[in-house]
Amino acid sequence: MADRAALEELVRLQGAHVRGLKEQKASAEQIEEEVTKLLKLKAQLGQDEGKQKFVLKTPKGTRDYSPRQMAVREKVFDVIIRCFKRHGAEVIDTPVFELKETLTGKYGEDSKLIYDLKDQGGELLSLRYDLTVPFARYLAMNKLTNIKRYHIAKVYRRDNPAMTRGRYREFYQCDFDIAGQFDPMIPDAECLKIMCEILSSLQIGNFLVKVNDRRILDGMFAVCGVPDSKFRTICSSVDKLDKVSWEEVKNEMVGEKGLAPEVADRIGDYVQQHGGVSLVEQLLQDPKLSQNKQAVEGLGDLKLLFEYLILFGIDDKISFDLSLARGLDYYTGVIYEAVLLQMPTQAGEEPLGVGSIAAGGRYDGLVGMFDPKGRKVPCVGLSIGVERIFSIVEQRLEASEEKVRTTETQVLVASAQKKLLEERLKLVSELWDAGIKAELLYKKNPKLLNQLQYCEEAGIPLVAIIGEQELKDGVIKLRSVASREEVDVRREDLVEEIRRRTNQPLSTC
């Protein structure tokens, strides 16, 4: 017991140490190192407790989904998939884990969030961090130079999640990408159109899509005097401007990353600007940026992009924002990110902040990193942050107390008298064979009232009632659960009548 008490004291002291580091705003690396020590101590403490103290729960950053939550999820996925297919995308899938070497060096400072799998004496493996790098690997492996694809799957990040804000360690991404050599900005404009179509269809609130270009960022850093070696690390600091103030970002640049204060101030003059095509034209005349080749190329492409966005009718939802940086290393051109302008809530409630709900950009060099000959395949794409969208939809449903159906059952096969199980089984089988979504209660002689109550609770719209008289007459009594109206339908016409009432097309199964 003395050893256990000593271990508990070590856990307490280490926990206090970690909290102190966070209050002092120590570096992320230092905090992570001390958190790792704390977790090891806790694991040791857990082993001492034995199996009888095991707490049944899901791992940190993960969750189970109830039938109600899955019904919401399926509706969201359906909206997204229909949009992807409307734009001509094919679907692919890739392994949930990749060779560690495949993922290494693609994510900048976020590489520390990759989950490495324990070495089993073979290949070094990691869980996928996103769907973009595996897609680039897939293109290079299969020597593909042209494809429009979508992919919906889980990804994994060793993050400190805020699950109430839709942030997890295991979560879905819904990606759409266009690979191939095309005229400038046409595929990029379509990706932004898709993003706007999906977010509008989901009706989760007003949103704004911020756009920028990595070439403009790099040109801006160059003219401000940022050393080449610090471009990516300063970029990751700028990327935090949607979460913290400019002063905090500046302090990080100067205090942690060694940037001269006057250089940081010059960056601040640029990154606090946002607007439309007029800002693009203004920056093309900027005395410093206009002398930088990369910046001029990026601004020229953005000007063309805005022309296409006007034609697509979505320019009112787009803002050129010089603070948008997107920390991932593989972006090479246009980048974009959608954020909610407001979160609809009940009066008096705090808005639910969920951060970015969709993002993407151009990554022309990523495939070349995997190709043996370094052949590049230009790519542009987007990713929908569905977990955050689920958080918004769930909160909205809870606030409205709206009933969510968790099944698609169209009709319950019921009986009004006893000893009709065989007839119910025959009828439900006929309905299944005809493609009708049907159920029956698993009792030989269920009470009619119980069967009707089940329909009301499950949201089943129709009841097909069998009785002795109906069997003699060759009819089925079809009851509407909502109106309680009943009509006799000839058995051979029942399938068509159910389809008509539930607006179901002819089954293709």
Curated annotation (Swiss-Prot):
Organism domain of life: Eukaryota
Modified residues (N-acetylalanine): 2
Subcellular location, record wording: Cytoplasm
Catalytic activity, EC: 6.1.1.21
Family as reported in the entry's similarity comment: Belongs to the class-II aminoacyl-tRNA synthetase family.
Function statement: Catalyzes the ATP-dependent ligation of histidine to the 3'-end of its cognate tRNA, via the formation of an aminoacyl-adenylate intermediate (His-AMP). Plays a role in axon guidance.
Protein name: Histidine--tRNA ligase, cytoplasmic
Provenance organism: Mus musculus
This protein's encoding gene: Hars1
